[in-house]
Amino acid sequence: MNTSYSQSNLRHNQILIWLCILSFFSVLNEMVLNVSLPDIANDFNKPPASTNWVNTAFMLTFSIGTAVYGKLSDQLGIKRLLLFGIIINCFGSVIGFVGHSFFSLLIMARFIQGAGAAAFPALVMVVVARYIPKENRGKAFGLIGSIVAMGEGVGPAIGGMIAHYIHWSYLLLIPMITIITVPFLMKLLKKEVRIKGHFDIKGIILMSVGIVFFMLFTTSYSISFLIVSVLSFLIFVKHIRKVTDPFVDPGLGKNIPFMIGVLCGGIIFGTVAGFVSMVPYMMKDVHQLSTAEIGSVIIFPGTMSVIIFGYIGGILVDRRGPLYVLNIGVTFLSVSFLTASFLLETTSWFMTIIIVFVLGGLSFTKTVISTIVSSSLKQQEAGAGMSLLNFTSFLSEGTGIAIVGGLLSIPLLDQRLLPMEVDQSTYLYSNLLLLFSGIIVISWLVTLNVYKHSQRDF
């Protein structure tokens, strides 16, 4: 009996190790290219509005894919979907590396990478729930969470070093390492029984078209893109009201406090993601830093601090409540953006401190936003509501990157508004930082109002 138990325990640990590897490289794939955006812009002679699509393309298919894989896990089985995700992710890596001299091929490769990498966060948690014993699941989730945080932390440093000393195109090959997990996971994971079910393909296509054309509008400001986006969303809303098992539960649309809360949370997440994508451009233009310095010295300390702030935020939520932590997080964000807008011309290390507080504030906000938003849900809405929140969180990051890329390409914003800014290279970034601060404060006030109303109603 002890032998059987030890073998089972060994199998569970092996599964967990390979899941950690997948989780690490999933996050790394998202983070490493961010610091190289200015280099890519220079290589292709493209404005930020176009270059930011290197990250936006990945986040778009990544966010949609997480929802799709989650819904398909019962119908097709985790084993098949994980294998499919790994192969697609590696296929995108090869296309991107081989065709890195062609911008259209690079963007296509990032779309493909995102579609493959989406399988990892969507299915890893399901694997833990199904294969890891109940008494060990908390530790397993905690370990995977720490690995993800570490991936987010070291991603910019690794990306900066490789891009500076070798070439940014080699960053596209990093996800290829996940191929080593295939034989082990195929052996360790059991063969699953496929469950028949309806899958709303039409709904996914309509929603995806609406999202893609909206993002194209935010970078090109072409009205035709906006019209196509609006029409797609209108048809999508009409469609999900008719089908029996829609991709998005239309009943959630009637819960106004929930929808407003999700929107405000998404705006906060998107604003920070847009800011992080702007940092490499800003540090190159204002302080003439190298890609390695931006990744290792400027961004790395902030991304690593997320681990500490996340732990502190969890303790504060238990002791002081979610609103207290939200207020601290928003204060960190808004004050950091405001301070940076006034003191952008100071030494480059000042931005390192700013990023620590920005990402710390984001960590606090993420810790509590799900608690605050879920308070407006009825019990029968909880599953669909939280799935929509997770989907929106991922999608908002891609949207924020696209919008900020578009704003960086608008000459009208490159005007002197603050009297203390002397260097012309700071005007655009200073104005956007001021805008970010205002957006955070407005979103915070609306979220507070939603939470207070939901507390009265439930």
Curated annotation (Swiss-Prot):
Top-rank lineage group of the source organism: Bacteria
Membrane topology: Multi-pass membrane protein
UniProt xrefs under CDD domains: MFS_MMR_MDR_like (cd17321)
BP GO terms, sorted: proton transmembrane transport; response to antibiotic
Sequence intervals crossing the membrane: 12-33, 81-100, 111-129, 140-162, 165-185, 201-221, 223-240, 256-276, 297-317, 324-344, 346-365, 432-451
InterPro entries: MFS, MFS_dom, MFS_trans_sf
Keywords on record: Antibiotic resistance, Antiport, Cell membrane, Hydrogen ion transport, Ion transport, Membrane, Plasmid, Transmembrane, Transmembrane helix, Transport
GO molecular function: antiporter activity
Pfam families, per database record: MFS_1 (PF07690)
GO cellular component: plasma membrane
Subcellular location field: Cell membrane
Function (record text): Resistance to tetracycline by an active tetracycline efflux. This is an energy-dependent process that decreases the accumulation of the antibiotic in whole cells. This protein functions as a metal-tetracycline/H(+) antiporter.
Entry similarity comment: Belongs to the major facilitator superfamily. TCR/Tet family.
The name this protein goes by in its record: Tetracycline resistance protein
Annotated organism of origin: Streptococcus pneumoniae
